[in-house]
Amino acid sequence: MRDESRLDKYVIKEILRINRHLPRRRKTLEELLREERPHVVNRDGTKHYFDRDELERLADILPRYLHGRLKLPILIELGYSGAAVIRGKAEVRVVCEVLGEEWRFSQDRVELNMLDVRKLRREFPTATQYMFSTEYIMGRPKVERRG
């Protein structure tokens, strides 16, 4: 049991290291549209710049009252299951619109297959980023080992 816990901690630490490219703080679409050179600062100190055309397309997709709620970049969580997850009401609404899927007001999470992820990334390469998730480690059921 101890070795398993130590391994989990090591894997989580490595995943966090891999995620250094993610922003320290995501900005809203509203904030980014006001910037001359829209960007966020990443955890590793580099800057991630957004394509203004992508931001304007996102602004066209979402009602204006949600511009202050859509946090960018949209994070595509990749985990153990093979599916990708998008979280956040405004983020999910955008993704559903782009993919032609039905969106429900209460929906704040959507799972995507890799074909959908590819389509989303192709349409919004600077407004989306991959994030490697530790959820599968912390959420997996513990298996008791015998002998």
UniProtKB/Swiss-Prot annotation:
InterPro entries: UPF0216
Signal peptide: none
One Pfam family of this chain: DUF61
Superkingdom assignment: Archaea
Family named by the database record: Belongs to the UPF0216 family.
Name under which the protein is recorded: UPF0216 protein MK1676
Species this protein is from: Methanopyrus kandleri (strain AV19 / DSM 6324 / JCM 9639 / NBRC 100938)
Lineage per the UniProt record: Archaea, Methanobacteriati, Methanobacteriota, Methanomada group, Methanopyri
